[in-house]
Amino acid sequence: MLRGIQALSRPLTRVYRALAVIGVLAASLLASWVGAVPQVGLAASALPTFAHVVIVVEENRSQAAIIGNKSAPFINSLAANGAMMAQAFAETHPSEPNYLALFAGNTFGLTKNTCPVNGGALPNLGSELLSAGYTFMGFAEDLPAVGSTVCSAGKYARKHVPWVNFSNVPTTLSVPFSAFPKPQNYPGLPTVSFVIPNADNDMHDGSIAQGDAWLNRHLSAYANWAKTNNSLLVVTWDEDDGSSRNQIPTVFYGAHVRPGTYNETISHYNVLSTLEQIYGLPKTGYATNAPPITDIWGD
């Protein structure tokens, strides 16, 4: 169990309840960015095969701004009791291409946030899971309706929701965060879920303390449940605060995770490669050449 945070010591029943600059990118154009890194089949490895994985993506903070920061006690408790990847880096700036890298193995040449992006039926983590008989769902805070493709709505931003860009991920699998299960229903979670807080709660517009409190309120129960239910929580960031170094926090917490600080260099492609390896999925995009993370797992 996580320690040192009041909310995590309570019973689960008391846990806190633009116009596109480069236009629509046709699937045929996007395919030209991935031609050199084809989808490659891979047998399931000896990595743990989790019943459920929840991936939370935060915004625009460097590792130095988060790890050791007293304004982020929940995240630092996850880091202290999980696998803290001390040399994790994003691919580029700004936000959107990093989300695409994490979800589909490629930035697709984006150099600015663009809406809409049309990824067509190019392979991605969601489509791979579905093709292999697993399940996927994306939970986005303030998404105005199931399957909505709007570019923005209040504090919701489509640029942070990569699965919406692909026709091989059914729109019914893009849902508001309000649909995220309560603790008693965690066994019904999809195989892999993405959780995207709104711009206030992902540290983009709001403070580190606000983002940490949101995670504590909404994901602490899942984090504790995951430890004893063959499940995993991954918390990462899209990019840092705009520096050329682009070093980001990334933490794995849950069952089979051996706590510690790990110093191998990783990127969003390595995280994607790890998830694909866990479920025996084809490696897609630049995940093809990104080794999976193998040293953080124990009994």
Swiss-Prot record:
Protein location: Secreted; Host cytoplasmic vesicle, Host phagosome
Activity control, per UniProt: Phosphatase activity is inhibited in vitro by low concentrations of several heavy metals (zinc chloride, sodium molybdate, magnesium chloride, and copper sulfate) and moderately high concentrations (>8 mM) of EDTA.
GO biological process terms, semicolon-separated: NADP catabolic process; phosphatidylinositol phosphate biosynthetic process; symbiont-mediated suppression of host innate immune response
Cofactor(s) the record lists: a metal cation
One annotated Gene Ontology cellular component of this protein: cytosol
First-tier enzyme category under EC: hydrolase
Entry annotated with the keyword Secreted: yes
One Gene Ontology MF term: phosphoenolpyruvate phosphatase activity
Key word Signal present: yes
Main location: secreted
Purpose of the protein: Virulence factor that plays an important role in blocking phagosome-lysosome fusion and thus participates in the intracellular survival of the pathogen. Acts as a phosphatase that dephosphorylates phosphatidylinositol 3-phosphate (PI3P), a membrane trafficking regulatory lipid essential for phagosomal acquisition of lysosomal constituents. Therefore, SapM eliminates PI3P from the phagosomal membrane by catalyzing its hydrolysis, and thus contributes to inhibition of phagosome maturation.
Record comment regarding domains: The C-terminus of SapM is required for interaction with RAB7 and SapM-mediated autophagy block.
Quaternary structure (record): Monomer. SapM interacts with host RAB7 via its C-terminus.
Name used for this protein in its record: Phosphatidylinositol-3-phosphatase
Organism: Mycobacterium tuberculosis (strain ATCC 25618 / H37Rv)
